[in-house]
Amino acid sequence: GLKIQDVLLHQARLSPFIVCYKETLTPGTNTPNPAIYSEKSKPGFTIRVADKMYMRDDWPDTMLDRIAKSPLGAKNKYVYSDNDFILLGKIVEAISGLTLDQFAQKNFYNKIGMYSTGFNPRNRFQAECLVPTETDNYFRHQTVMGDVHDEGAAMFRGVSGHAGLFSNAYDLSLLYQMLLNGGELNGERYLKPETIKLFTSYNSDISRRGLGFDKPEMNPDKDSPVCGCVSYLSFGHTGFTGTLVWADPSKQLIYVFLS
């Protein structure tokens, strides 16, 4: 079996990702297969992946089955994997009895005051408040706006451990200020200081990673996600769509970059 620690460190031997969306397209035309997608939400087709594009409800289970049956990679190797965080999100749901978005909203975002943060922003904001993500000409064939960029996360109802979270710089600064404060913000405690220290410290013999967090590269021969001006106490995470959040306890500094 897989160890949670190895999954958090991206050294659980899972593949980086599995491209499931291509299986749902019509061969030759690369357009949505009408057996899998409907232009309207209806019984059996309620998973919205874009405008006028609702996926069959059984496909998330198919995707999880693909992950579960995928071959494992080499031992003692660091490979960043979307599948790691997809599984972690499912573990949170299984333990809490809540969907991942419900759990995060209830225990963190609402209490902290992160009112612009959450999954599926179309359900909470007017269209004029949303920024277009991309012009998708390979899967959804439209301008994607208010729907997650990642195809797999879209197929998981827009809620997944590896992608789908929308936010802004102010909200993210609140979250990371709570972490810098040792788990407390505005008189409310969310996490124990020792928990934050454990997760944001170097935890691997084969990579620079913390538990879930990225860290500065200590090996001068390897590329680092940050410049040399930040301390080894610092931690954060980058995002595929051009995002980065980083905190340095030694300088009490938070850096948020959302492109």
How does the language model describe each region?
Residues D6-L9, G118, V245-W246, I254-L258:
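Structural recognition of the beta-strand scaffold that forms the well-ordered cores
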Residues S234, T241-I254:
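Short, surface-exposed beta-strand/loop micro-motifs that present aromatic residues
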Residues V92, L179, P249, L258-S259:
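Short beta-strand segments enriched in hydrophobic/aromatic residues
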Residues S207, G239-T241:
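Short acidic/glycine-enriched loop/turn segments that link adjacent beta-strands
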